[in-house]
UniProtKB/Swiss-Prot annotation:
Family in the record: Belongs to the AlaDH/PNT family.
Binding site for NAD(+): 132, 176-177, 196, 218, 237-238, 265-268, 297-300
Lineage of the species this protein comes from: Bacteria, Bacillati, Bacillota, Bacilli, Bacillales
Cell division among keywords: no
Location of the protein in the cell: Cytoplasm
Active-site residues per Swiss-Prot or TrEMBL entry: 95, 268
Gene encoding the protein: ald
SUPFAM superfamilies: Formate/glycerate dehydrogenase catalytic domain-like, NAD(P)-binding Rossmann-fold domains
Annotated positions binding substrate: 15, 74
Name this protein carries in UniProt: Alanine dehydrogenase
Length: 378
């Protein structure tokens, strides 16, 4: 199979879909890999490293996109939709519930789109987990930075000092992002509260952190109280493939103290805070509303691309090899985890939460893939 790795064009997205090591694994299995010139530079990988691994360095992005399977990091931007075609296998993060125009374009062009974030093995999301770990850890340190007065914050040191109270961190969502945010916040010495719907998960968090955190069951009263007290609010809710629910209302934000900070990690699925009304970028990461600093960057791990790219390649390559070795149709038929990642195929929306949120008919993956001639690698 011919596999294309284009350069990411999202604002300050310095990750790349494959390391040279990942390329070598695909090539050793008999596949061709086309890497766009400079695709790995942001992550510290020179063109020569990819060439040494056996990749072909291509200057023209169209030629890269003409590959049978394209591997990316972030969702394609509108200027990349022109490359969509029937038979293309696209393997990347998509977050389609928050990207209706992208979903429509993929559907219209008959692209076989497999989303990293919905590939699932049991109750785990193996291709989302490493980036969730990165984003969670970053959320605490970014929040700490923006609490500094020169960054617009109230001038709070999360750790406090002897004789001065510690900063209060509220984390909504006790999954991978929330747990990693808590690890960092606890490590910084903050006063940490975690809110989650699942009482069993809260028990697990109590076992992990003990007396270092407080836990609360998720309901509007507990959320309102914890948000009002927070110096830093970290939003870490995930419903796989679906749009994030609004849990923090504008009225709750108004009750926060001036200079408090919100980091909404769920923004790539629409966000859970009513006042987080647009995505921000690494160039302009924050805005102020009701006296509160809002951080809503959708590609947080792109700021630490070396770590993120290596972590991502570690988990995506085994699945990419299955697609490349077997062809997309057989790989999807054989592997239920990979099949759960299928979001569009042959003009159909094949992930139920995306179909529901965007108002499309849901077509099960098995039915959508019956016409094998519509899928690359068949």
């Amino acid at each position: 199979m011919i596999i294309g790795v284009p350069k990411e064009i999202k604002n300050n997205e310095n990750r790349v879909a494959l390391t040279p090591g990942g390329v070598s694994q695909l090539i050793s299995n008999g596949h061709r890999v086309l890497v766009e010139t400079g695709a790995g530079l942001g992550s510290g990988f020179e063109n020569e490293a990819y060439e040494s691994a056996g990749a072909e360095i291509i200057a023209d992005p169209k030629q890269v996109w003409d590959a049978e399977m394209v591997m990316k990091v972030k969702e394609p931007l509108p200027e990349e939709y022109v490359y969509f075609r029937k038979g293309l296998v696209l393997f990347t993060y998509l977050h389609l519930a928050a990207e209706p125009e992208l979903a429509q374009a993929l559907k219209d062009k008959g692209v076989t789109a497999i989303a990293y974030e919905t590939v699932s093995e049991g109750r785990t999301l193996p291709l989302l987990t490493p980036m969730s770990e990165v984003a969670g850890r970053m959320a605490a340190q970014i929040g700490a930075q923006f609490l500094e007065k020169p960054k617009g914050g109230k001038g709070i040191l999360l750790a406090g000092v002897p004789g001065v109270s510690r900063g209060k961190v509220t984390i909504i969502g006790g999954g991978v992002v929330g747990t990693n945010a808590a690890k960092m916040a606890v490590g910084l010495g903050a006063d940490v509260t975690i809110i989650d719907l699942n009482a069993d998960r809260l028990r697990q968090l109590d076992d992990i952190f003990g007396h270092q955190i407080k836990t609360l069951i998720s309901n509007p009263v507990n959320i309102a109280d914890a948000v009002a007290e927070a110096d830093l609010l970290i939003c870490a809710v995930l419903i796989p493939g679906a749009k994030a629910p609004t849990l923090v209302t504008e009225e709750m934000v108004k009750q926060m103290k001036p200079g408090s900070v919100i980091v909404d990690v769920a923004i790539d699925q629409g966000g859970i805070v009513e006042t987080v009304d647009h995505i921000t970028t690494h160039d302009q990461p924050t805005y102020e509303k009701h006296g509160v600093v809002h951080y809503a960057v959708a590609n947080m791990p792109g700021a630490v691309p070396r770590t993120s790219t290596i972590a991502l390649t570690n988990v995506t390559v085994p699945y990419a090899l299955q697609i490349a070795n077997k062809g997309a149709v057989k790989a999807l038929a054989d592997n239920t985890a990979l099949r759960a990642g299928l979001n569009t195929a042959n003009g159909h929306v094949t992930y139920e939460a995306v179909a529901r949120d965007l108002g499309y008919e849901y077509v099960p993956a098995e039915k959508a893939l019956q016409d094998e001639s519509s899928v690359a690698g068949a």
